[in-house]
Amino acid sequence: MQCDNEEEYDYVIVGGGPTGLALAQVLSLSLKRVLLVEKRDYLGGCHGVTRVHDGMMTEHGPRIYIDNFLMFTQLLNDMGVQFDDLFVKYNFSTATMMLEALRVLTVREIATLVWSFMTLNDSFKETTLMEYLSSHGFSNAAIDIFDRIGRLTDGGSADTYTLFSFLQILNQNFLYGIYQPRVPNDVGLFRIWEDTLMKRGVSIMKNAAIDRFIVGNASDASDASDASDASADAKAKVVSGIVLRDSRAESRPIVCGCKRVILACPPQEVQRILSAHSELGAAFGPGFDRFQQETQYLPYISVIFHWRSALRVPTIWGYPRTSWGVGNIVLSDYMEFNDPRSKTVISAVVTMPDRPSELLKLSANDIGDKRGVMREVFRQLKQIYPDLPEPDYQFLTQSAYDAASRRWVPFNHAFMTTTHGHVPNQSVLYDNLYNCGVQNGNSSYSFTSMESSVANAVHLATELQPELRLRGLRVVKVREAITVRAVVAAAIVCVGVACTGFAMHKRNRGRVK
């Protein structure tokens, strides 16, 4: 814990995931006093690593990274690190995914998709993938495969995924490589990130529990002459501090005064904070609770398997083709674990927890026992890799079973872009309270990812501290990279120019004759 009692900060950032880390990194460049607050004992949010059984790795995964993460790469460079230092090329690509889909699509369905891709526009953000596929007569097999791809790539089913986001998978990612971390993120990425913040004077408090927010009127901190100037307006309210304590033990509360508070969390976590602290009220408007319910990432169940021996696992894309939609990545093909118990490691995820197993006739949510779920996940994994021996270790650590609702509830949450759009950063009640994350829509990258998280953070930081733009810091737009549509458009222009030139040349030759 590094927050001194009754300290004053320019910024208190709640949430130690990629958004919070990026905010702290960028705001520290303005020489502001920053406190980063994280409720867990590790940083990274959904990208973080949980250690169990004397240091064995588990994760909320599997996760991927792409080399068109331009803003993320810029932040890495600011930390003195290159993208390739931390990540290695994945054995599969966006083309792998498209080829999987082409196996079941008819010529008519392919032509329909191509036309929609070439006419891609913002109106597609108002249409779900299911609405599009159903209205254009796609087969059940096509709908099923697109639903499974959506669940694997961006945490959404066909009835929540927007048509715009789905087509952007191809447009923004097809020409780029997919990567995996070279080492677990707590050893690589987040250790480097934390060290950088510490060197720049950012205070970091892990295992932090929020006792309360200190709220009042802006006029309390201003001259009495200003107090009579419409201070009854809701916008005159401010959050002047936050009271924290160490969640691991009974400890004296720590009062941290602040000029601004940023909840760097997905909407579900922001709403949890609002519900737990009535002093904040409906800080982001009366419709925020409904918004967070309608934009929730699918409740995945992550399971990880470790073997003491180095196995020859076939190179097969971990597409969720099984009855529970079990997807996977063989992490040991890419990561160095430096642990004799982890010579082979497969990270698996149940993307369809409500679908029944063809063997058990039960869904994952019907089974409230960890061992029962892990046993069935491994059985379905063997449908992909038939020669897998029984694992030496297996863990389900990222979810807990809620017996009342009969479902596995993940510890980590994320935002899913749906037809319900995005929300603004600033509170409607408090001048100095903000939420920040993918839910704000200030990234041209269409997916819930490391890139969209940090891009939204940089956008807010430069809004709050405009002088950062003078340092050349700005949100890099994905459209500044090469996309498939840009290449196609350029090719059409080139062909048009060539045809025009050929026609003119032919006409001129005719005149000479």
Regions inferred by a protein language model and the residue ranges of each:
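Short hydrophobic core segments
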Residues: 12-14, 37, 210, 254-270
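Mobile amphipathic helical/loop "lid" adjacent to a hydrophobic cofactor/ligand pocket
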Residues: 72-163, 171-175
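Glycine-rich FAD pyrophosphate-binding loop
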Residues: 28-53
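Glycine-rich active-site loop/strand segments that organize a redox cofactor
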Residues: 44-68
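C-terminal lid/capping helical subdomain adjacent to the catalytic/cofactor pocket in oxidative enzymes
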Residues: 413-513
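C-terminal segments that line or cap access tunnels to active or ligand-binding sites in enzymes
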Residues: 179, 258-260, 265-410, 429-430, ...
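Helical element adjacent to the flavin cofactor pocket in flavoenzyme catalytic cores
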Residues: 168-217, 233-259
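N-terminal Rossmann-like FAD-binding beta1-loop-alpha1 element of flavoenzymes
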Residues: 9-36
